[in-house]
């Protein structure tokens, strides 16, 4: 569970992929990007959304992490399914809530978009998970992979936080470079101050 200690350098190697995804999101004209997840898979993106807000030209990032029918209905009423990107996030791929969210919103999107519904969905999951298989079967636009050695609550600097960050228009490379400064400032080579 200590994979987060080195994640910044690993994710910086993928900065161009996140930038390309961000450009694609912008070009699609999505008005909303909705993270469907629970716990650590949704907490990091929620903090990013609350901290940075909506960026011009990019979708508003929203989080659905409650199965309460009123919250699901309220979220659905606030979006245009034809202009929404869904980010289904589950490390294990077997967490009940994200799977229920995926099934519900995919069915709703198919009613509006038909066979193009998968183009409005991306998955963030660990390699080999049930979510990976479901995303492939449902023709999701893209699957991003997390790191099995990182627990959900430490995953904001992995794909679980960076995919939503890119979708909302944040410069992921800059975010990671700033995180690297802090990582290096707290590293084992830094002498303690007395």
Feature names for model-found ranges:
Residues 23-187:
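Glycine-rich phosphate-binding loops that contact phosphosugars or nucleotide phosphates
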Residues 1-31:
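Cofactor-/ligand-binding subdomain signature composed of acidic, glycine-rich
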Residues 191-194:
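C-terminal and late-domain segments of enzyme folds
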